[in-house]
Every structure is written in structure tokens, then in C-alpha cells.
Amino acid sequence: LYFFNFINGHVAATMDGDTKKKVFPELMPRTLYWFRWGAAWTWVTGVVLLIVIYWMGTEGFMPDDFTTNEANGDGPNMYIHMMLAITFLAVFLYDFIYKSKLASNVRLATVISFILIGAYVYTLKYCAGFEYRTFNIHLGAMFGTMMAFNVWFRIWPAQQKIITAIKNGEAPDGDLVALAGLRSKHNTYMSIPLIWTMITEHHSGTSLTGGGWIPYLSDNNNWIVLLIVVALGWHIVFQLYKKSAKIKGF
């Protein structure tokens, strides 16, 4: 992912047509093979772990009313099941937004996306009743689903046509180039928050999630930490893009 976004694009821009015609049909199918199957493997194993450890596990990660509440006999909390569905269906709203005219206004689309993410996390905590680790990993699952979708249903189909055009000595469709580039960039931006959700699963109850030394941070507002990490992760990627454009070859 980082090779494509921080290195490959800049190197490709220095190639002439004949070089691209020789290199791209040999290089890109090979790199994209490992790229897309790595994405598929990560998503499938992640979903399996989510089901086994969280949905079916006995560690108490899910709220008591995930199924019938044994304490009072009430039925399951439908907010939980609605939010689980949204976790894996939000990709279609994301795809709709970034196929619409709204995508041309990057700042507005980014703000709307962040607000929707905030609403999702807030609802997971206060309506579905998820604890930190549970809403943390479900946000990761949502990002991971979007990233895998981008790889298999947007980037790879577009790249197949782009590579074929270059191989035939033709100019690739500009819309396809833009689509593949945009979705790959989105995956790069989502990757940092996703990594956070995976590596901080054992930190529930520490200072970063409430109950530690950070003033005013408690279990009531620890969902804000996750949103700060999302924003910080996006900013880090933004700075990495700027840095990658300044690194030159010999």
C-alpha cells in the first residue's frame, strides 16, 4: 500500500511511454496479485476473529443484551444488531459519496466522512452499549471492509484496464486512473486508524481509554480518543504524502 502511494507513483511519473509499456505489464500484475490477496486474507481472518472472539466469545466483550438479556428476560438490543450491520454495509454509503459530485470537494467530503465516523462510534457506545475495545475493533472492521472493497472492486478492475491500455501503447482512461488513485489514497488514509484499532485492543482501562492519568478522560468520553486518533492518523498520512513528493532519485 505504502509502496504504491509513496514511491511507485512518483517513479512512474519519470518514465517515458516505452519504459512504461515494458515495465508496467510485468510489474503491476505481480505486485497487485500480492496486494489484493493480502487484503482478502486480512479481511477474512479479521472477520473470523471478530465473530469468534467478540460475537461468540465468553469474555464479555459484547453487551449483556447482545442476545436475550438473561437478567430481565428482555429481547436483544436491536441497536447492537443494527450497528453490526452498518459496520459491514457502510462501505456502500462510502462508495456512493465518493462516486458522487461531492467527491470533487475534498474538504467537504472529508468533513462529512469524519462526522459520519463520529456518529457511528458515538452510537456504538451510547446506543449499542459497546465498551472501548468493542467499538474500537468494530471501527477497525468497518475501515477494513472499505479497504478490501476498494482493492477488489475499484482498484483492481481499474488497474486491469489501465495496464492493458499501456501494454497496447494506448493512453489509459483518465477516469480509471483517477479512480484507482483516489481509492488507493483512501486506503492509505484509513490504514493508520485501522492499525491503531488492532494494536490497542489490550489497552482497555489504561490512560488512553479512560481511568488513567490523563485529566478529564473517563469511560464516558473515551470514544473521543478514537476520533482524535482517526484525525491524527489522517494528518500523519497527509504529511507523508507531502514528504514523499520531495524525495528525489539520483
Model-derived regions: residue spans:
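Polytopic transmembrane helical bundles with strong interfacial aromatic enrichment
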Residues: 1-250
